[in-house]
Regions:
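Blade-edge motifs of beta-propeller repeat domains
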Residues: 1-8, 54-66, 107-109
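Acidic, small-residue rich beta-repeat scaffolds with periodic aromatic anchors
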Residues: 3-5, 70-132
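Signature of short aromatic-glycine-proline-rich micro-motifs recurring in repeat-based ectodomains
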Residues: 7-18, 132
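Extracellular/mature segments of secreted proteins
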Residues: 9-12, 46-48, 116-118
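Hydrophobic/aromatic beta-strand elements that line small-molecule binding cavities or substrate pockets
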Residues: 15-19, 45-49, 69-70, 93-96
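Acidic/hydrophobic-patterned starts of short beta strands in beta-sheet-rich repeat architectures
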Residues: 20-34, 72-84
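Short, solvent-exposed loop/turn segments at conserved positions within beta-propeller repeat blades
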Residues: 39-44, 87-91
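Surface-exposed loop/turn elements that mediate protein-protein interactions on large endomembrane-trafficking
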Residues: 47-61, 96-106
Length: 132
């Protein structure tokens, strides 16, 4: 419905990127939803699909604005840093690790990047644990 209403084709509403998270398994497909159909504000749908012996499988399903591969690995797969914007001054940073089947959240921090009152960038981001 949204695609038709906005006169968009699917390829105009998503972005794709290949990531190399496990050299033995081959590339992983990163799909990011774009506004107006699959994102609102800075955050959109983010999906990762990996190819395994039994075919393609979704290995991460979330909402955010950035996924960064890290150098650290779990079970042979690169760990991921996943960012989700909360406000103009704050974001959530999640660490994801591969459990052998899919990526699961392994850590979470609230990161304040700018002064809440003025919007000016902080000299150094302030991190705290996410509330439970």
């Amino acid at each position: 419905m949204c695609l038709d209403d906005n006169h968009l084709r699917l390829e105009q509403a998503i972005s794709t990127e290949w990531l190399n998270l496990n050299e033995a398994a081959g590339p992983v497909l990163l799909l990011k939803g774009l506004a107006p159909c699959f994102a609102s504000g800075a955050n959109g749908s983010i999906l990762l699909y990996g190819q395994f012996y039994d075919g393609w499988r979704k290995i991460l399903d979330g909402t955010g604005h950035q996924v960064l591969p890290l150098r650290s690995k779990t079970k042979g797969w690169g760990d991921l840093e996943f960012w989700q914007q909360q406000s103009a001054s704050e974001s959530i940073r999640r660490l994801y690790r591969f459990d052998g089947y899919e990526y699961l959240a392994a850590g979470c921090e609230m990161v304040q990047l700018a002064d809440r009152a003025t919007g000016k960038p902080l000299p150094k981001p302030i991190s705290s644990r996410c509330p439970k």
